[in-house]
Design a protein with these regions (language model features):
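Short linear clamp-binding motif
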Residues: 3-7
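N-terminal leader/linker segments that precede catalytic domains of diphosphate-processing enzymes
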Residues: 8-195
Length: 195
């Protein structure tokens, strides 16, 4: 049985995924840790690359992932003047793993190459929460740049360029029960917190 299972797994690997795995291993990236704990899989990285959400740059000694993203803090003020902030509570993966992140933004979305940050913020809110936001509801906070690792891809150096916004939603956009983003591999849960 093990041999059949092994064959089935390799049969589904594309040449593109094999090439990416070999490229990462060339730089001693511990891809065997990916897809466990809080990390994503090589297939997730391949999907990001093919979706123009990131790119990889090789040098003699290392490989670096570059991403540009928008982060949006979402607020609601109710009829009693109580202010609420939306927070990501958790992600539940189809394989049974749960990941909790202390995200500085309510919604974070990787931008497509050449995408305007405001358009990326509106798209991200629609994709993650199902809310149609108008541009006037968003105010720019700041841009930021930083380097570091990634919980999603352990061992892979990543350089980030971010655009931060605040968003004030209206009563008809507010769901007191929060929101659930459903993707093919996971669900992400968002809850309101009184501030």
């Amino acid at each position: 049985m093990k041999w059949i299972k092994l064959y089935e797994e390799f049969e589904s690997l594309s040449q593109e995924m094999i090439d990416l795995t070999n490229k990462l291993k060339k730089y001693d990236i511990p891809v065997e840790l990916w897809g466990t704990g809080k990390s994503k899989t090589i297939k997730h990285l391949l999907d990001e690359l093919n979706g123009d959400e990131c790119y990889l740059e090789e040098s003699e000694s290392k490989i670096t992932r570059y991403i540009e993203f928008v982060g949006v803090k979402i607020y609601y003020t109710d009829e009693n003047d109580v202010r609420w902030a939306l927070k990501e509570d958790r992600q539940e993966f189809n394989d049974g793993r749960t990941r909790r992140r202390n995200m500085p933004s309510s919604v974070s979305e990787k931008m497509k190459f050449g995408e305007d940050p405001l358009v990326g913020a509106i798209r991200g809110i629609k994709e993650e929460l199902g809310i149609d936001i108008k541009g006037h509801q968003l105010t720019k906070r700041r841009d930021l740049h930083y380097n570091g690792g990634s919980l999603s891809y352990p061992g892979l150096d990543t350089k980030y360029k971010g655009h931060q916004y605040n968003c004030q939603i209206e009563r008809e956009q507010f769901d007191p029960n929060g929101y659930i983003e459903i993707q093919k591999d996971k669900k992400t849960f968002f809850n309101w917190v009184k501030i």
